[in-house]
Amino acid sequence: MIDKTQYRKFYKNIRNSIQHDVVLNKSRLICNELKMIEEVKHSNAIFVYLSYGKEVKTDEIIQYLLSKGKKVLVPKCNIDTETMIPVEIIDFSQLEIGSYKIREPIVSNEYFGRIDLAIIPGISFDRFGNRLGHGKGYYDKFLEDTNICKIGLCYSDCLSDKKIPCQDTDIPMDYVITDREVLKLWFFILTVHFAKLKFCEMREGEIC
C-alpha cells in the first residue's frame, strides 16, 4: 500500500512540473468556479489561505471576496505549536513574509467571530474529499470541532482517483474544485458519518 509520504512526493513532483503560465490559467478557472458556489455567495466571513509557490493562486479570490463586502480571514501561523489563527485583512498591504516564507498578516489580532466557510490548499485531494497536505496538521487542527463549509482547491493534475490514506484526525472537504470539475462531497460525508453511527448502535456498548 502506498503511504502518505509517497503520495506527497508523487503529487508534489506533478505540481512542481506545471508551468507558471499554466498555473495562472488553471487558478483563474478555479476562481471562476468558486464564485459560482452558493455557499460562497451566501457566506459573510470566509477564511482563505495565502498561496505560495505552485499552489492554486488565491489573490484573485481574495480581491473578489473583498469587492463583495465579505470579511476575509487569512492564517497566521505559530511554528512552535504548529497551529494557526484567523486574522481579518482588508488589503494586501497588511501582509508580510512570515513563517515558512509564506505571506501572513503583520498583526496577530485573532478573529473570534463566526466563520462561515474556509478555502483550503492541498498538494492533492481525492474524490472522497480527503486532503493531502504537508503533514504538519495546521489545517486539521484549525478545522477541528468546527461547522465550517470546507472547500479544497487543487489542479486537475493533482486530483487522485485513488483514496488518499487518512487518519481520524484528517478533516475531509465538503467541496473540491479543480480547473476541470467541481466535486460536491457533503452528501457523501454525511452518508459515511451516519453509516458509522448506525454501525455503532448495532454493537452495544461500543464507543465510536
What annotation goes with each model-predicted range?
Residues V48-L50, I120-P121, T178:
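Redox-cofactor binding/interface segments in oxidoreductases and associated redox assembly factors
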Residues H193-M202:
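N-terminal amphipathic/hydrophobic targeting modules at extreme N-termini
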